């Protein structure tokens, strides 16, 4: 078997998003820093895919407690894909490419600059999600909004995965 087919067979993942927030905010107009709408990614390994039709997120936890504002499901995850620009009514187009050779550390100045200028998530810049993707895995993209007045208007989203063949 050829080495490129066994070690890290995924080469690139490309996300295309057309979205915008509700179009108003108290501050941060046109920036990513003031945005409370974003997209998270999750790689679901093939062996962990649910078999039943019910995969919804419960409103209350196992103890009957409602999700509070600091609940992990209500905050950007470490795998934040992209934020919307804050207070922009028109549709914005985002093109995010992850490559298996990416190698930007989440705690680097370069990652901070990319997050500030492009709205990308810091932890997705190191290429690890691409290198760890296996045949059969599923990529989920979650559109999120944090507060009641904030809304994430998603017009289109696509995910393309490129493999070594």
Language-model-detected regions and their locations in the chain:
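Extended, solvent-exposed segments with strong compositional bias
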Residues: 50-135
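A short beta-strand element within beta-rich, extracytoplasmic domains
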Residues: 6-29, 139-144
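Short beta-strands within extracellular/lumenal beta-sheet-rich domains
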Residues: 1-6, 23, 119-128
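Exposed low-complexity, polar/acidic, P/S/T/G-rich flexible segments that act as propeptides
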Residues: 27-51, 124-165
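Core nuclear transcription-regulatory modules in eukaryotes
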Residues: 16, 33, 43-44, 80, ...
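Eukaryotic cytosolic interaction/assembly regions at protein N-termini and domain boundaries
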Residues: 1-4, 9, 32-35
């Amino acid at each position: 078997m050829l080495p490129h087919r066994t070690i890290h067979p995924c080469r690139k993942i490309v996300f295309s998003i057309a979205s915008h927030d509700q179009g108003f905010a108290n501050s941060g107009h046109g920036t990513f820093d003031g945005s409370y709408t974003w997209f998270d990614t999750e790689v679901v390994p093939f062996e962990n895919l649910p078999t039943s039709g019910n995969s919804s997120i419960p409103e209350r936890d196992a103890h009957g407690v409602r999700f509070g504002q600091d609940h992990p499901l209500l905050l950007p995850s470490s795998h934040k894909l992209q934020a919307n620009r804050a207070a922009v009514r028109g549709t914005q187009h985002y093109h995010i490419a992850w490559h298996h050779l990416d190698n930007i550390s989440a705690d680097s100045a370069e990652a901070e600059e990319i997050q500030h200028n492009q709205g990308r998530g810091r932890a997705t810049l190191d290429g690890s999600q691409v290198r760890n993707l296996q045949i059969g895995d599923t990529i989920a993209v979650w559109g999120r909004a944090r507060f009641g007045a904030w809304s994430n208007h998603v017009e289109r989203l696509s995910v393309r995965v490129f493999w070594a063949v």
